[in-house]
Amino acid sequence: MELAIILIIGFAILGVIIYFSMRAHNKMVSEGQIISRRTNFMENAEEFTLVLADPDQVTQAVNALDYHAIHTEMKASSQQQIFQFKGSSWTAQLRRLKEDRNQTLYRFEFTNWKTHNGMAQDALNMNRLTTAIEKAFLALDPDTQVRSVPLEFKTRHSIL
């Protein structure tokens, strides 16, 4: 009988935790802080094709992001259009791939991330950064085309 009561209380607590987690997630989605994504979204690069982008405007847009709120550091090489991002357990990069005719192609990808039980440890801030970068490109050119490209990556397993 005591075990049944403990299990009921445990499931009730778990239900409350899940409820508040989903509520917080839905609030961030409605506020535009994140986009609902698959749990393995970091395994894809995002490519942004936009009308000939002025590198200075891209640099300004990337510099204007609120990195403090995303718990992220950013280092930029404005001339080469390479931006490095570092979170608590991950790194990412945004760079200009090519510019031809009237289009510029940028690629954003996570280059390294740690997992726990198969899930990215800091997926929330990874999602926040991805969303912020997508919004920055759409603000520069509302007709920006966004394409997801699967990454080729290697996994290292820790014994401990």
Located regions from the model:
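Ser/Thr-rich, low-complexity intrinsically disordered terminal regions
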Residues: 18, 23-46, 54-160
